[in-house]
């Protein structure tokens, strides 16, 4: 798998390196965007394409009594996101699910906010995925 192919769905050792690079490299734009996201202290947030979980960690800080759930289809990304957010997972404030944004398993109208950082260009069918997120 080429370096750039590993950005779409990180796998193996190269994927682990890629996820670490994404957590770091996407940080400036994510921090900028999160400044504009107003959340209540007990907000319920979904992060689509959560990658290595760095933005989930930031979201958990913005809503310290809330719940943040993440979805990603890369096993490597899910493992990293779970590791990075282990404390919040143990507290019942965080869930990381492996799956596709095309088919979100969570209940309709459950979330107060949905985020997707540096990921929509990987979504297979944008209109379908956005309809799924909107529900």
Question: Over which residues does each language-model region extend?
Answer:
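N-terminal, positively charged/glycine-rich alpha-helical extensions of SAM-dependent methyltransferases
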Residues: 1-15
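Conserved alpha-helix/loop element of class I SAM-dependent methyltransferases that forms part
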Residues: 24-43, 58
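Short alpha-helical
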Residues: 28, 54, 75-76, 121-124
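Class I SAM-dependent methyltransferase SAM/SAH-binding core
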Residues: 46-103
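A short acidic, Gly/Pro-enriched loop at the edge of an enzyme's catalytic core
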Residues: 102-113
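A short SAM/SAH-binding and catalytic strip from SAM-dependent methyltransferases
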Residues: 113-126
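A short glycine-rich, Lys/Arg-flanked "PGG" loop and its adjoining helix->strand segment in the class I
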Residues: 127-135
């Amino acid at each position: 798998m080429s370096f750039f192919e590993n950005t779409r769905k990180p796998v193996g050792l190269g994927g682990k390196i890629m996820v670490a690079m994404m957590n770091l490299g996407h940080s400036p734009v994510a921090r900028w965007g999160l400044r504009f996201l107003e959340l209540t202290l007990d907000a319920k947030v979904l992060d689509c394409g959560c990658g290595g979980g760095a933005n989930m960690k930031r979201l958990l800080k913005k809503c310290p009594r809330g719940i943040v759930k993440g979805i990603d289809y890369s096993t490597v990304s899910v493992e990293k996101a779970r590791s990075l957010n282990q404390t919040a997972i143990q507290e019942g404030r965080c869930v990381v699910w492996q799956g596709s944004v095309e088919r979100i398993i969570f209940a309709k109208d459950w979330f107060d906010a949905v985020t997707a950082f540096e990921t929509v260009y990987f979504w297979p069918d944008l209109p379908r995925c956005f309809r799924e997120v909107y529900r």
